[in-house]
Amino acid sequence: MAGSKCLALIAHDQKKDDMAAFARANQELLSRWKIVATGTTGGRVLDAAPDLDVTRLKSGPLGGDQQIGALISTGEVDALIFFVDPLTPMPHDVDVKALMRLAIVYDIPMALNHATAIKLLPTLEA
């Protein structure tokens, strides 16, 4: 991933449609980025915007959140867009909290909902 800016995309199950719509509507801006995503989210993003450069990692509950956290800690992820569903309990909630903690510790831009992502994306330099 060296040499190009990397954006991580993650969405909880109830927010995957929103992430797919976000990717489709923002293909031009997203095309400037190398994208890493958890498995299912990455698949949905590719279905919606097949020309994007998306690397799919494991599904969130199977370690994908932790994989993205590791990439944040090594400086390989430059920004995070994570569409969180606050109304549905997540069995891997501790992984989600750890991921958000790493984004804060390493001071990378992070959007947790569509409204923030829409404002953040154009301000990021790819």
UniProtKB/Swiss-Prot annotation:
Source species, domain of life: Bacteria
SUPFAM superfamilies: Methylglyoxal synthase-like (SSF52335)
Broad class of enzyme this protein falls into: lyase
InterPro entries from the UniProt entry: Methylgl_synth, Methylglyoxal_synth_AS, MGS-like_dom, MGS-like_dom_sf
Any Pfam family matching the protein: MGS
Residues given in the record as substrate binding sites: H12, K16, T38, G39, T40, T41, S59, G60, H92
Gene Ontology molecular functions: methylglyoxal synthase activity
One GO BP: methylglyoxal biosynthetic process
Keywords: Lyase
Family the entry assigns: Belongs to the methylglyoxal synthase family.
Biological function: Catalyzes the formation of methylglyoxal from dihydroxyacetone phosphate.
Name the record gives this protein: Methylglyoxal synthase
